[in-house]
Amino acid sequence: MSEQSPRDPVAASENRKPSFRFDADIFKLCTRYLEENNYHGLALIARQKGLPPFLRLRIWPILLKHHPFVLNPFLQPDNDVLNKPKHDSDQDDRAEGQLNDEDIRFNIKKDLKKYVQRLKYNSSPDINEIEMEMLEVLEKAIFKFVKKWGKIIKYDQAITWIALGLAEWLPPIENTHWVLIGRDVSSSDNLYITNIMDEYSTYIENVPDLEDYLNDVIASPQMKFSDVFERLVLVLLHSPENRTRSPSSKVNKTTLPLNGGTIEDRVSFFIYCLRKLLPELSDYFQEEQILNKFGSNDDEWLIWWLKWCGSKVWSRMDRGRIWDMILGWRLQNPKKSTAYYQDKLKLTKHQLEKLGPDVFWSVSQHDEETVDERGEPDEFKKSDSFKDLLHGLSMANISASSSNTNSPSESTSPLLTPTRRSSSSSTSLSEGIDDMNIPFSRLDPHIELVFISLALLKSKEGTLVELDQHEIRQFLSRLPTKSYNYTTRYQKYKQMKMEKEKEEDNGNGSVSSEASNSDGGSQIITNDNANSRRYDFMDNVVNEAGELWRKWFWSEAVDNE
């Protein structure tokens, strides 16, 4: 993003508007699901396309309420909690809790103050009444969580940063539109809060009656911020139960993608995949002593990425898109038929085509005649070792589902199969029902995050290889946003192209949208100003993560021959 003076109200206002584009049909589907409180449909859109940012304040609480990790929570206990000797009486526990309360509150306030100082560039910033009230809500929510779950995980500054990340999209003060502004932009009046509706005003103005609809959404009853925050932490920090925590235990690469693992497992898996998928960057990291002595504070950026799901270190926009995926993560219940979900979702084939397959799809061991995207035979299906690897993943998935009825892992459709649908344009739900495969999640969400993190590194590889050790760690600890301004030259090219297309279409195009020819006449509504066009490449990063997953999967198949 181009640098603008925080004292220039015009520049700051323009700079503050984030890039956002969304298919009009999917947006209508999203609002329909929201009105119906259809959490199945909202989860589907969240994981496939991401959510309209200005609707997260209402949709995230719904997704969290019904998330499998909230219905059946499990947090990986801290090592010092695991090794802590049991007290002989409850009195010792109460005494320790009383002693820690003041310290916990002090630490929470201190970490909240760091956020304010970071945005206001002042060690003693002035705080207005609304900002003060927001900080009080955050402090109470964090303290409430620590008091409830403190015997499993102790307070860490990252818990406060998760609350701050939530407050960047969910107004802490009920029935208001005030959210934290984030670190990507500066405020002309030195505020660290913003009206989320003003941020997306260009988009909202392009959709008839949307402003009134959003005002009704804000005015309606909402879940308390503290309750949403607790559920969010349970999802982001979820860990599978009954894992062997011995330091000498090896990561099982055939079960980890589906069952997930501890943060130690995921870090080891990340480094392994980095060496295999991005060898040149991995070699450069090794030269610069990056990730060579993991466990110290030198490379704590990776813990922020993988354990704390990008809190603090990722930009507000990028992190919001990834949290959409995590909150929308759902496995298909093996006890429910395809017809059950189709009845719940009421999707047409055209809508399913727009939503696309699960990002982390792969081939199925059950398909005898698997073809690639060009319709040609898929050669690597001939590898018995590939089938063995896939069979191992299948068995791990079935085992996980049988041990956890609240978050079933087995799918009634072939495991790890890309969604392939008929090219028919029929929209009848009664026709071709077997072809309408609804895209459910396949991998554990924290393993998805591993591949997303690798894709982020790949997108920044050209920059990283030009930096030294200190600069690399600083860069990865404050990753720039993927949304950037188009160059003037490209703006002129785009304008000429749009004018030419408009002439060819005899002026039939929509003024408030960008036509997407590849989507068969889709209408794409944008939040970008015509004179300051930007584009958010986070969807490209997500898609690249899927490609890296398949590349890793194929590589493992070849290596096991």
From Swiss-Prot:
<protein>
    <recommendedName>
        <fullName>Oxidant-induced cell-cycle arrest protein 5</fullName>
    </recommendedName>
</protein>
<dbReference type="InterPro" id="IPR000195">
    <property type="entry name" value="Rab-GAP-TBC_dom"/>
</dbReference>
<feature type="compositionally biased region" description="Polar residues">
    <location>
        <begin position="507"/>
        <end position="529"/>
    </location>
</feature>
<feature type="region of interest" description="Disordered">
    <location>
        <begin position="399"/>
        <end position="434"/>
    </location>
</feature>
<feature type="domain" description="Rab-GAP TBC">
    <location>
        <begin position="50"/>
        <end position="330"/>
    </location>
</feature>
<dbReference type="InterPro" id="IPR035969">
    <property type="entry name" value="Rab-GAP_TBC_sf"/>
</dbReference>
<feature type="region of interest" description="Disordered">
    <location>
        <begin position="498"/>
        <end position="529"/>
    </location>
</feature>
<dbReference type="GO" id="GO:0005737">
    <property type="term" value="C:cytoplasm"/>
</dbReference>
<keyword id="KW-0963">Cytoplasm</keyword>
<comment type="similarity">
    <text>Belongs to the OCA5 family.</text>
</comment>
<feature type="compositionally biased region" description="Low complexity">
    <location>
        <begin position="399"/>
        <end position="430"/>
    </location>
</feature>
